[in-house]
Amino acid sequence: MNVTKDENPRSRSQDLHLFHAWMMLIMTVLFLPVTETSKQNIPRLKLTYKDLLLSNTCIPFLGSSEGLDFQTLLLDEERGILLLGAKDHVFLLSLVDLNKNFKKIYWPAAKERVELCKLAGKDANAECANFIRVLQPYNKTHVYVCGTGAFHPLCGYIDLGANKEELIFKLDTHNLESGRLKCPFDPQQPFASVMTDEHLYSGTASDFLGKDTAFTRSLGLMQDHHSIRTDISEHHWLNGAKFIGTFPIPDTYNPDDDKIYFFFRESSQEGSTSDRSILSRVGRVCKNDVGGQRSLINKWTTFLKARLICSIPGSDGADTHFDELQDIYLLPTRDERNPVVYGVFTTTSSIFKGSAVCVYSMADIRAVFNGPYAHKESADHRWVQYDGRIPYPRPGTCPSKTYDPLIKSTRDFPDDVISFIRRHPVMYKSVYPVAGAPTFKRINVDYRLTQIVVDHVVAEDGQYDVMFLGTDIGTVLKVVSISKEKWNMEEVVLEELQVFKHPTAILNMELSLKQQQLYVGSWDGLVQLSLHRCDTYGKACADCCLARDPYCAWDGNACSRYAPTSKRRARRQDVKYGDPITQCWDIEDSISHETADEKVIFGIEFNSTFLECIPKSQQASVEWYIQRSGDEHREELKPDERIIKTDYGLLIRSLQKKDSGMYYCKAQEHTFIHTIVKLTLNVIENEQMENTQRAEYQEGQVKDLLAESRLRYKDYIQILSSPNFSLDQYCEQMWYKEKRRQRNKGSPKWKHMQEMKKKRNRRHHRDLDELQRSVAT
């Protein structure tokens, strides 16, 4: 496969070659021995939903019993609020505590629209309702909101008011407008929108069936305002596009060059129908595009698109591609023109399940848009590089007075420029990740990545980009990518967090840097998740350093949130290597085995016993040592058919007297080894145990006799002290007690006997009735 070209097709032989490459990769992954390198891909810390609740670092939103499907979030750091779009509802929540004094707007779909939706064969619960898909800040006082309206999208304005302390939060239901080309009809269709300069840019389907997809601009205060969209007549502009994200990004210091970049995936058909595939794209348009004068009227005249590549280079030239873009995140930098672009991709194969994160630079994206165009003679031909004359001004360039005083708007573009852009919207070259390969990948796991947000964190030993990755099973991975020697990258999965009680796909995530919180939405709920939980790593300096979490450092007393400061304080942290020896060498308790838990266990000869040892870190490897009774030396325990090493500890079958001693469970991470558990095992001889049991049995009989005697003595006193209490009454009482005891002792058997007795009685009465009827006749 020619990796330097975007639109070159894959032939059948190339597809077959790629299939063999996939199979070789699968076999390699399946039969790869478990090494320390593979252990690094395991999450170091795995916390369940219950663990997160107990740590008070995960707060579920409890205020919605009727409105679910939380896939639209709008975070307002300035006001300290989170707007949540759900089914038939819009919620106003506090960023500090989701459940504190929240407000809601009930906005259902019209009843007649719900009935029409049902008649069209749509699901009454999952589709025929008003699912909120657009929440965009319109100005300082209003938010623009759109809902699917039971496949009849509507939009309106929510008034928040100017007072930040007392928000109004009211929907203006008297000025609702059509949501077509602004909001999808289908609540489950991928969709992207952004509001800038009071213009709404949306990528969505424009019809009920969802076949016609378009990227549009609407609203605005321009006097000659018209909605602008992609050209529906040209199939190679957009082909079944699924929009993922859209962002305003300035290209230069000149505002006339400002552009809207949008990311999507679409179908690509090359030549014949057998060459259909899914491609991920980045597209762009100029913000000041108003359409053409004689051609492309009310259509984009600056629309261009290029392919995004996310693949693992193969040794034999066949790359492993992750073609389906799932989410995009722009990490801001000091230069607003050059944010870092993070993308989550998945494989299209149903056989091979994999996900990857690829990182792109805006410089590389712009270079592709400034490069050669792709050309296609007809629908049956393939894309090739265009080598002909390129008209002036270069197609895709924004009109600017500084660029050309004669071209003040896109309506001033010459006809040959409009004609060229109409037939050549595709760039020939593709955009590749900055490292030439994925920054992070998950292969051969039971989930796929769905969402991403990234936080740039300053640590003691450098700066790191921490990725929070949502999955389709309701977990969040906290990942840091660390640069090593020779530009090699190390993927470190710090945490795997089960943020929902039951598996559910994560649909949206918003990051609050001010609150240091992550807000995670799914079909089933919304949770507020802390970015860090340093105290869960341990109570020693070594535990804190081994965590390699850029958010956390040892402050001398505990593992706590690291804050960069000019003051010289003893903050111990080693994200790059995770080596406690270099950081905690002067803290004896942190590197000594004296901090290990100590337990005493008794085992019986010839029986089995289990010595539990579960390291907090899943990346640690465990070794066992024994110091036998009367011996000063320790020896390493080697597993055999009698001694079995498991992930949870050591199973010793058929205990022997020589197994007595002190057992040390040592965990190793990187080069650091420390004892986490010390177990003293005492083996009781079998003969001694039998004698003890015999003595206990005899002693138990005496105790029962004494206890029974005490009961009898109480009863005798009761008879003597109560002249009205006869001996017959006492005997009858004792008989009932014994009967009750026997019944409780064998209650299942007793119930069975009672049922049998009832059946016999019923059968007897039935037979008697039949006999009486026969005699009567």
Curated annotation (Swiss-Prot):
Residue stretches of biased makeup (Basic and acidic residues): 766-777
Signal peptide positions on this chain: 1-37
Domain Ig-like C2-type: 592-680
Keyword annotations of the record: Developmental protein, Differentiation, Disulfide bond, Glycoprotein, Immunoglobulin domain, Neurogenesis, Secreted, Signal
Disulfide topology: C117-C128, C146-C155, C286-C398, C310-C358, C534-C552, C665-C731
Glycosylation, residue list: N139, N607, N724
Top-rank taxon, per record: Eukaryota
Gene Ontology biological-process entries: cell differentiation; nervous system development
Domain PSI intervals: 533-585
Entries under PROSITE patterns matching the protein: IG_LIKE, SEMA
Subcellular location: Secreted
Comment field on protein domains: Strong binding to neuropilin is mediated by the carboxy third of the protein.
Positions with biased composition (Basic residues): 740-765
CC annotations in GO: extracellular space
Name by which UniProt lists this protein: Semaphorin-3D
Protein family membership: Belongs to the semaphorin family.
Annotated segments matching region Disordered: 740-777
Species for this entry: Mus musculus (Mouse)
Role played: Induces the collapse and paralysis of neuronal growth cones. Could potentially act as repulsive cues toward specific neuronal populations. Binds to neuropilin.
Keyword Disulfide bond: yes
Residues in Sema domain copies: 44-531
Presence of keyword Secreted: yes
Chief place where the protein resides: secreted
GO molecular function, a single term: semaphorin receptor binding
